From Swiss-Prot:
Ranges for region RNA binding: 245-251, 269-273
InterPro entries hit by this protein: ArchSynthase1/Queuine_TRR (IPR050076), TGT (IPR004803), TGT-like_sf (IPR036511), tRNA_ribo_trans-like (IPR002616)
Cofactor binding summary note: Binds 1 zinc ion per subunit.
Role summary: Catalyzes the base-exchange of a guanine (G) residue with the queuine precursor 7-aminomethyl-7-deazaguanine (PreQ1) at position 34 (anticodon wobble position) in tRNAs with GU(N) anticodons (tRNA-Asp, -Asn, -His and -Tyr). Catalysis occurs through a double-displacement mechanism. The nucleophile active site attacks the C1' of nucleotide 34 to detach the guanine base from the RNA, forming a covalent enzyme-RNA intermediate. The proton acceptor active site deprotonates the incoming PreQ1, allowing a nucleophilic attack on the C1' of the ribose to form the product.
Similarity section: Belongs to the queuine tRNA-ribosyltransferase family.
Principal EC category: transferase
The protein's name: Queuine tRNA-ribosyltransferase
SUPFAM superfamilies: tRNA-guanine transglycosylase
Record-listed E.C. numbers: 2.4.2.29
Cofactor: Zn(2+)
Catalytic residue list: D89 (proton acceptor), D264 (nucleophile)
């Protein structure tokens, strides 16, 4: 993997990541395909939205005992018929999500299988082996994600252990002679001194890119913005920066303007299945009765398959009837919206209109976002 910074405008970055499997223009948004699928869509449909890279979850694929089946296909790319780059999440956030089922130790995480209740152990080394078998283009270290709020002492203890896990992940990754990329994950809660230490130590270890974890876990948006503004200037300019699990369109813009290159989140696909659709002027809640007789396009500025072929009234009908096609068409649109947003951000830097774009975005959506 090779990252090239093409342009920097007041902290916002325009870049390019070269993988063996293709090029990713940044800023970039990665749809979440937890089990090797972006829910309801084929990989061809995902690609048609402008998606360059997908995130899959190594932890969940491992829990489903799919590792050996995937190896029979060669790798995860062949298994799911996606031949662009794939990034895999190690499972740190999922471990955080099932905290009532786990016991975290220096060695790793002991937990009960959330499906069958069997005892399972996951170490940093095991996580590297799982992701190696998947053939991930970007591998994530195993870390611990702390909740919000958390006391300083607890945040420090967790962050220091995550650093030791990062060292072990780094060592095992290179023992496997993995030629793909390994990203470190910055932790430390809302405490700038802990974030500083995490950044410093991860840079000393040396990673191909740096992710910012432990955000969007319930903290006020202002806290997240302050942490991003504090961290990003400390990171190497020649390495990509990835904000994990964030978020809504305005979150992407705020992350980008502070120096983030890569994003992932379930929001566009999950919200699509719930009938919450992102449009140029904000959000359309398509199940609302006012759309029953609305024969206009969902978004006249959108070029996706859904907007080019179906009315709001039809999408309302599908949603009210709980038809699978509704979820599919909604997902196509929301993903295309996110990819158009990323393309607009790239264009704004290329043309020197970043500040104008941000102002226009908020002017259009001020009364509609939630």
């Amino acid at each position: 993997m090779k990252y090239q910074l093409l342009k920097n405008c007041a902290g916002a970055r325009r870049g390019r990541i070269q993988f063996d499997r293709g090029v990713v223009e940044t800023p970039a948004f990665m749809p979440v395909g937890t089990y090797g699928t972006v829910k309801s869509l084929t990989t061809e449909e995902v690609k048609d939205t402008g998606t360059q890279m997908i995130l899959c979850n190594a932890f969940h694929l491992w829990l489903r005992s799919e590792q050996e089946i995937i190896k029979l296909h060669g790798d995860l790319h062949h298994f799911m018929h996606w031949y662009g780059p794939i990034i895999t999440d190690s499972g740190g956030f999922q471990i955080f999500s099932i905290s009532n089922l786990n016991k975290i130790t220096e060695a790793g995480v002991y937990f009960r299988h959330p499906i069958n209740g069997s005892a399972i152990f996951l170490s940093p080394e095991k996580s590297m082996e799982i992701q190696y078998d998947l053939g991930s283009d970007i591998v994530m270290v195993l870390d611990e994600c702390t909740p919000y709020p958390v006391q300083w002492d607890e945040a420090k203890k967790s962050m220091v252990m995550s650093l030791r896990w990062s060292e072990r992940s780094h060592k095992r990754f290179h023992e496997l002679k993995n030629n793909n990329a390994l990203f470190g994950i910055i932790q430390g809660g809302m405490y700038k001194d802990l974030r500083d230490l995490s950044v410093k130590k991860l840079i000393e270890i040396g990673f191909d890119g740096y992710a910012i974890g432990g955000l969007s876990v319930g903290e006020p948006k202002e806290n997240m913005h302050h942490i991003l503004a504090h961290i990003c200037p400390q990171l190497p300019e020649d390495k990509p920066r990835y904000l994990m699990g964030v978020g809504k369109p305005e979150d992407l813009i705020e992350g980008w303007r502070r120096g983030i290159d890569m994003f992932d989140c379930v929001i566009p696909t999950r919200n699509a299945r719930n009938g919450h659709l992102f449009v140029t002027n904000g959000v359309v809640k398509i199940r609302n009765a006012k759309y029953k007789y609305d024969i206009t396009s969902l978004d006249i500025y959108c070029d996706c398959y859904t907007c080019c072929n179906y009315s709001r009234a039809y999408l309302h009908h599908l949603s009210r009837c709980n038809e699978i096609l509704g979820a599919r068409l909604n997902t196509i649109h929301n993903l295309r919206y996110y990819q158009r947003l990323m393309a607009d951000l790239r264009d704004a830097i290329d043309t020197g209109t970043s500040q104008y774009f941000i102002e226009e975005f908020y002017n259009k959506t001020r009364n509609s976002y939630y």
